[in-house]
Swiss-Prot record:
Coiled coil feature spans: none
Annotated glycan sites: 43
Disulfide bridge positions per record: 28-51, 31-38, 44-64, 70-88, 89-94
Lipidation (GPI-anchor amidated asparagine): 102
Protein name: CD59 glycoprotein
Residue ranges of domain UPAR/Ly6 in the record: 26-108
Species, as recorded: Chlorocebus aethiops (Green monkey)
The record's account of how the chain is modified after translation: N- and O-glycosylated.
Lineage: Eukaryota, Metazoa, Chordata, Craniata, Vertebrata
Any one cellular-component term (Gene Ontology): plasma membrane
SUPFAM superfamilies in alphabetical order: Snake toxin-like
């Protein structure tokens, strides 16, 4: 494949990446006070790209979160809890109690589709 074919492939991958971006804000369950059964859904503000559910003993926190802060140290510091389980996800209303119990998943379907597309494109480029 020549330079022109590589440019076309890059352009197609760029278009795919743009279309994979949903264009709407993420919806998460969000309860200002810890509860065991949060049913309040909100549209997350700009910059909050992840839903969080965290459990510290009997306290369960559901809220919009920043993926960059989805680690034990940041979560425990911001929630002021020293021991907790947590789960971050990037799909609408994905932060419900069963996610902590089942272990959940961390990759969205869009992410998987994009990764598979990139792998297939790379394999196609490397094929003689």
């Amino acid at each position: 494949m020549g330079i022109q074919g590589g440019s076309v492939l890059f352009g197609l991958l760029l278009v795919l990446a743009v279309f994979c971006h949903s264009g709407h804000s993420l919806q998460c369950y969000n309860c200002p006070n810890p509860t065991t059964d949060c049913k309040t859904a909100i549209n997350c503000s700009s910059g909050f790209d992840t839903c969080l559910i965290a459990r510290a003993g009997l306290q369960v926190y559901n809220q919009c979160w920043k993926f960059a802060n989805c680690n034990f140290n940041d979560i425990s510091t911001l929630l002021k809890e020293s021991e907790l389980q947590y789960f971050c996800c990037k799909k609408d209303l994905c932060n419900f109690n069963e996610q902590l119990e089942n272990g959940g998943t961390s990759l969205s379907e869009k992410t998987v589709v994009l990764l598979v597309t990139l792998l297939l494109a790379a394999a196609w480029c490397l094929h003689p």
